[in-house]
Amino acid sequence: MTKVFINGEFVNEEDAKVSYEDRGYVFGDGIYEYIRAYDGKLFTVKEHFERFLRSAEEIGLDLNYTIEELIELVRRLLKENNVVNGGIYIQATRGAAPRNHSFPTPPVKPVIMAFTKSYDRPYEELEQGVYAITTEDIRWLRCDIKSLNLLGNVLAKEYAVKYNAAEAIQHRGDIVTEGASSNVYAIKDGVIYTHPVNNFILNGITRRVIKWIAEDEQIPFKEEKFTVEFLKSADEVIISSTSAEVMPITKIDGENVQDGQVGTITRQLQQGFEKYIQSHSI
C-alpha cells in the first residue's frame, strides 16, 4: 500500500485529500522540491531543503520545520514505500482559506504534502544524448523561487514534446536562460558557460554539483550570459536537473551540436557526477 505524507500524517494514497479551497489549487500559492534517491539514499537532500526553506521565506510562508525534520520526514516516506531508486516530491501551500488574492487573515496552517516515485536512471539518454528546441521564455520574473506556478514551463515542455524534443531551451530576447525543467550549459574551447544566478533562473542543485565537479576537475566554469547563436555554435551542450542528471544535448532545433556526438567534457562531468552520488547521498 503506497503511503503519502499530508497534513502531518502518513496515510494511504487513496486517503490523501486536500480542500478545494487550498491556495495551492486555486492560486498555485506554494513551493516544492524534488529529491533523488539512489540505492535507498537521499542525494544532496540538505541542499534541496535549504532551497525549499528559502523559497518559503521568499513568499512569506512560515513552515515551522527544520531541515533535519524535513530530512527525517522524506527518509521515513522513502522507507514506507520501499523506494530504492526514484524520487520524492514535496510541496507546501499557504493552506485552505476562502478564495481571496491576499494572504489569509489570520494566517491558516500550511499544507505540506509529499509522495514518492520509483524509477531507474535514464541510462540510454545519458549515453547517447537527447534533442532540444529553443523557445522564448514567457515565465514570470521570480524564477529563482521554486514555485508551484509552472504554466510557462508546462507550455514550453509541451512545445518540445510536439516536436519530439526532450527539452525546450528558453531565451529572453537573445539570451539563453534555462530549460523548461533544467539548467543549460554551453561548452566552448574547454570552458563551461551557464547563465548567472539571478531572478531569471532557478539555481539548480545539480547545477551546483556540476560547478563543484568543474572545480575538482579544474575545468573553467563561467557564470555569464550567452546568446542562442553562441549556444548553437558550442562544442558541447548539456542540461542538468535532479531527474536528468548531466544530460548531453546532441541536436538543437534540428541541427547537430558539432558532430552530434557526446563530447569529452560532458563525459568527464558525468563521471564526476557518479562520484558525487556516492559522496553526497545519506
From Swiss-Prot:
Catalytic reaction annotation: D-alanine + 2-oxoglutarate = D-glutamate + pyruvate
A cellular component term, taken from the record's GO annotations: cytosol
Residues annotated for substrate binding in this entry: Y32, R99, H101
Similarity field: Belongs to the class-IV pyridoxal-phosphate-dependent aminotransferase family.
Role: Acts on the D-isomers of alanine, leucine, aspartate, glutamate, aminobutyrate, norvaline and asparagine. The enzyme transfers an amino group from a substrate D-amino acid to the pyridoxal phosphate cofactor to form pyridoxamine and an alpha-keto acid in the first half-reaction. The second half-reaction is the reverse of the first, transferring the amino group from the pyridoxamine to a second alpha-keto acid to form the product D-amino acid via a ping-pong mechanism. This is an important process in the formation of D-alanine and D-glutamate, which are essential bacterial cell wall components.
Subunit composition and interactions: Homodimer.
Protein name in UniProt: D-alanine aminotransferase
Organism of provenance: Staphylococcus epidermidis (strain ATCC 35984 / DSM 28319 / BCRC 17069 / CCUG 31568 / BM 3577 / RP62A)
Origin organism lineage: Bacteria, Bacillati, Bacillota, Bacilli, Bacillales
